[in-house]
């Protein structure tokens, strides 16, 4: 199976998000890469489901709370930008202050 670099990146994000999801379910607080991966994967999946950019920008702020992440992580993440594939093409989704 041949994958493009973009497809490999998507799989890497998905794998990291899956790990983050499992750790969150166990009650573990997420670190920086896990938090970014979980938010990014949720945005990409939402785009695949047909949500709009505006909906995903709002949705991105509901995925994690300060209680879900290690101390200081919320302050480190000011924006998350994800190139997501929508039915009408690829668009950049920016989620400002995603962890509230």
Curated annotation (Swiss-Prot):
Claim: Cytoplasm is one of the keywords in the record: yes
What Gene3D superfamilies would the database entry show? Urease, gamma-like subunit (3.30.280.10)
Instruction: List keywords of the entry alphabetically.
Output: Cytoplasm, Hydrolase
Q: In which pathway does it act?
A: Nitrogen metabolism; urea degradation; CO(2) and NH(3) from urea (urease route): step 1/1
Instruction: One Pfam family, please name it.
Output: Urease_gamma
Location(s) in or outside the cell:
Cytoplasm
- CC terms in the record's Gene Ontology section: cytoplasm
Asked if the record carries the keyword Amino-acid biosynthesis, the reply is: no
Q: Name one GO molecular function term.
A: urease activity
The EC number on file is 3.5.1.5
Question: Reaction catalysed by this chain?
Answer: urea + 2 H2O + H(+) = hydrogencarbonate + 2 NH4(+)
Name its GO BP terms in alphabetical order.
urea catabolic process
Main location per the UniProt record: cytoplasm
The EC category is hydrolase
Q: Which HAMAP family match?
A: Urease_gamma (MF_00739)
Give the family per the record.
Belongs to the urease gamma subunit family.
Oligomeric state and partners? Heterotrimer of UreA (gamma), UreB (beta) and UreC (alpha) subunits. Three heterotrimers associate to form the active enzyme.
Q: Return the protein name.
A: Urease subunit gamma
Q: What organism is recorded for this protein? A: Teredinibacter turnerae (strain ATCC 39867 / T7901)
């Amino acid at each position: 199976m041949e994958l493009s670099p973009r497809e490999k990146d998507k799989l890497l994000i998905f794998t990291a998000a899956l790990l983050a999801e499992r750790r969150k379910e166990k009650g573990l607080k997420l670190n920086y890469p896990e938090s970014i991966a979980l938010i990014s994967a949720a945005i990409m999946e939402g785009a695949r489901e047909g949500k709009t950019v505006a909906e995903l920008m709002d949705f991105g702020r509901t995925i994690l709370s300060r209680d879900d992440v290690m101390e200081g992580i919320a302050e480190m993440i000011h924006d998350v930008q994800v190139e997501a594939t929508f039915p009408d093409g690829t668009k950049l989704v920016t989620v400002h202050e995603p962890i509230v």
